[in-house]
UniProtKB/Swiss-Prot annotation:
F-type ATPases have 2 components, CF(1) - the catalytic core - and CF(0) - the membrane proton channel. CF(1) has five subunits: alpha(3), beta(3), gamma(1), delta(1), epsilon(1). CF(0) has four main subunits: a(1), b(1), b'(1) and c(9-12). Pfam families: ATP-synt_ab, ATP-synt_ab_N, ATP-synt_VA_C. This is ATP synthase subunit beta. It comes from Thermosynechococcus vestitus (strain NIES-2133 / IAM M-273 / BP-1). Produces ATP from ADP in the presence of a proton gradient across the membrane. The catalytic sites are hosted primarily by the beta subunits. Keywords: ATP synthesis, ATP-binding, CF(1), Hydrogen ion transport, Ion transport, Membrane, Nucleotide-binding, Thylakoid, Translocase, Transport. Its EC number is 7.1.2.2. One of its GO terms (cellular component) is plasma membrane-derived thylakoid membrane. Optimum temperature is 55 degrees Celsius, activity was detected from 4 to 95 degrees Celsius. Coiled coil: none annotated. The gene is atpD.
Length: 482
């Protein structure tokens, strides 16, 4: 939220080039880089115009070049510009929960003003080395497939890959629900350069599933910050920082565990590339900005665990033309601790969450971090599923009967594992009617060990579908027998 500035430093517009505005100030009164500038006046039609810009370059001759955070329609040369003397600041604290904001921290959900007592600037340094939590610890999500095969690091960054309609949103909402109920944490969702319709759908789905309480927003579990596709590149480039600033307050002041969702991290890079070209910088590889690594690093280095609390970030990653060597995803990968890949073939089988157990990775899956038992169980599950995958062509051509006894047993266990990796979600209760399940890591490991050891070879595979822990699978098998 840009506070109405005192008119101590006033300049005027000298040039407008799309979303970029050049402004001249009196000699000796140049605003600092990243300062917010406020332009207010009337356009040619006599209508009020109010635009906030951010200083990006000092051009010399008392002129600065700034990037607008909203449309520059109606701006004319000679219009007055007020230097606010500070960067863009956004409201922070529990008053932000259940509300939707734009890049400037202004509410856009037509629910009135926000009762936040504090605002913070969106440009802040990353925590110092002495404040960081150095011991890696696993962040339990209660989702079996994630906790077993791609454990999330507390304060880590996870890339979420998946096409349309494979369940990205549902996984996000389940994580938001679980961090609130099991960890007493909150979430912040930064919608960076995605479709307005999707933002609206997400908000309505969150109300339906109880993540947002429409009647009493303070009971909500999430704050939303949107900068959609139709916004100028300045807004799309900065909205990620606005969301991150809100998350940092929950971590540093409220000392909570925070989940920060960024959808989509590629659009953040894309917006930076547009702004870079508008500012006249020489493009780098594939037309990206020369400061690509710095821009991504400035955002990513602030997402971390401190000794007080943590920000664990889940970032949807769009891969242009499926080219993983493109500079935008390649730069992002350098910061990720793990990847959660969603598979359309699993979704088609009705196995939700449709996380690909062989395609997803995590650098937390090491015996010295998760323990020998967890590590060996996860690797055995992956080996069984990999063998099943190799045998599928033979099964398709010759049938199951042509397999050796050992391979038939592997296939039977793999099919049970595949089904046991599914589970009913709390946020999907309203659609499926099945109560959601939170499964602890201990129960998850125990369940898969029992399947691998052959203890449950006599149970039908449908008993493992859409259940929580292994005891529920046994109970379901008893029911199926009856």
């Amino acid at each position: 939220m840009v506070i109405s500035a005192e008119r101590t430093n006033v300049g005027f517009i000298t040039q407008v080039i799309g979303p970029v505005v050049d402004i001249e100030f009196p000699s000796g009164k140049m605003p600092a880089i990243y300062n917010a500038l406020r332009i207010q006046g009337k356009n040619a039609a006599g209508l009020d115009v109010a635009v906030t810009c951010e200083v990006q370059q000092l051009l010399g001759d008392n002129r600065v070049r700034a990037v607008a955070m909203s449309s520059t329609d109606g701006l004319v040369r000679g219009m007055e510009v007020v230097d606010t003397g500070a960067p863009i600041s956004v409201p922070v604290g529990t008053a932000t929960l259940g509300r939707i904001f734009n890049v400037l921290g202004e509410p856009v959900d037509e629910k009135g003003a926000v009762n936040a007592t504090e605002t913070l600037p969106i440009h802040r340094p990353a925590p110092s080395f002495t404040q960081l939590e150095t011991k890696p610890s696993v962040f339990e999500t209660g989702i079996k497939v994630i906790d077993l095969l791609t454990p999330y690091r507390r304060g880590g960054k996870i890339g979420l890959f998946g096409g349309a309609g494979v369940g990205k949103t549902v996984i996000m909402m389940e994580l938001i629900n679980n961090i609130a109920t099991q960890h007493g944490g909150v979430s912040v969702f930064a919608g960076v350069g995605e479709r307005t319709r999707e933002g609206n759908d997400l908000y309505n789905e969150m109300i339906e599933s109880g993540v947002i309480d429409k009647d009493d927003p303070s009971k909500s579990k999430i704050a939303l910050v949107y900068g959609q596709m139709n916004e100028p590149p300045g807004a799309r480039m900065r909205v990620g920082l606005s969301g991150l600033t809100m998350a940092e307050y929950f971590r540093d002041v409220n000392k909570q565990d925070v989940l920060l969702f960024i959808d989509n991290i590629f659009r953040f890079v894309q917006a930076g590339s547009e702004v870079s070209a508008l500012l006249g910088r020489m493009p780098s590889a594939v037309g990206y900005q020369p400061t690509l690594g710095t821009d991504v690093g400035a955002l990513q280095e602030r997402i971390t665990s401190t000794t007080e609390g943590s920000i664990t970030s889940i970032q949807a990653v769009y891969v242009p033309a499926d080219d993983l060597t493109d500079p935008a995803p390649a730069t992002t990968f350098a910061h990720l601790d793990g990847t959660t890949v969603l598979s359309r073939s699993l979704a088609a089988k009705g196995i939700y969450p449709a996380v690909d157990p062989l395609g997803s990775t995590s650098n937390m899956l090491q015996p010295d971090i998760v323990g020998e038992e967890h590590y060996q169980t996860a690797r055995a599950v992956q080996a069984t599923l990999q063998r099943y995958k190799e045998l599928q062509d033979i099964i398709a051509i010759l049938g199951l009967d042509e397999l050796s006894e050992e391979d038939r047993l592997t296939v039977a266990r793999a099919r049970k594992i595949e089904r046991f990796l599914s589970q009913p979600f709390f946020v999907a209760e309203v659609f499926t009617g099945a109560p959601g399940k939170y499964v602890t890591l201990e129960e998850t490991i125990k369940g898969f060990q029992m399947i691998l050891s052959g203890e449950l070879d006599d149970l039908p595979e449908q008993a493992f579908y859409m259940v929580g822990n292994i005891e529920e699978a046994k109970a379901k098998a008893e029911k199926l027998k009856a």
